[in-house]
């Protein structure tokens, strides 16, 4: 049987009329600031912390809607995780696909296609790493080359880095 204190806590929470995310307490913020310092070596002040509502895709959608307006061109490498391109089309933005190409046993960016499309008025690029569905962890050189294309064409990059603390196969 379940301990009475657990049953009581569940009943108390279930009686609350809102089932959404609760208010974050100070220990949560302390843990985030501690992790950022320990893992990444930088200190963040409490007043500089801002947390998005539930989930990365929701947050990326909000950012996309703030940075663009309906009809703006948004590029997404394809294939890709459905919610990343769905947020573009459902928000009335123009989806511009840039294909990933199979080369030397793995997917990589088609830089020529990326460059041509970025120069055609793309406002935002949506990225993810590791890439979903291919699983590719982009090499530093690939990211730097892609960012140069977008910097040159004044494109904003929105990147899903939800797995940034997970290091795969020697990648950093």
Regions found by a protein language model. Name each.
Residues 32, 87-88, 150:
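Short hydrophobic alpha-helical segments of the AMP-binding
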Residues 66-88:
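Conserved PLP-anchoring active-site segment centered on the Schiff-base-forming lysine
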Residues 78, 97-102:
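Short beta->alpha connector loops at strand-helix junctions that form conserved
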Residues 59, 83, 165-166:
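Catalytic P-loop NTPase motifs of RecA-like helicase/translocase cores
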Residues 100-171:
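Active-site phosphate-binding strand-loop segment of PLP-dependent enzymes
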Residues 90-96:
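A short helix-loop-beta submotif of the ANL/AMP-binding
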């Amino acid at each position: 049987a379940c301990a009475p204190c657990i049953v009581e806590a569940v009943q108390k929470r279930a009686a609350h009329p809102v089932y959404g995310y609760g208010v974050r307490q100070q220990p949560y913020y302390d843990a985030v600031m501690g992790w950022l310092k320990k893992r990444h070596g930088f200190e963040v002040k409490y007043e500089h912390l801002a947390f998005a509502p539930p989930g990365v895709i929701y947050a990326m959608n909000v950012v996309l809607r703030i940075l663009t307006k309906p009809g703006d061109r948004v590029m997404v490498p394809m294939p890709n995780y459905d919610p990343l391109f769905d947020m573009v089309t459902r928000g009335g933005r123009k989806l511009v696909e840039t294909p990933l190409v199979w080369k030397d046993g793995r997917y990589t960016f088609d830089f020529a296609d990326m460059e041509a499309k970025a120069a055609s008025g793309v406002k935002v690029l949506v990225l993810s790493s590791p890439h979903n569905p291919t699983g590719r962890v982009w090499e530093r050189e690939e990211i730097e080359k892609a960012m140069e294309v977008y910097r040159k064409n004044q494109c904003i990059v929105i990147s899903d880095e939800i797995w940034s603390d997970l290091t795969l196969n020697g990648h950093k």
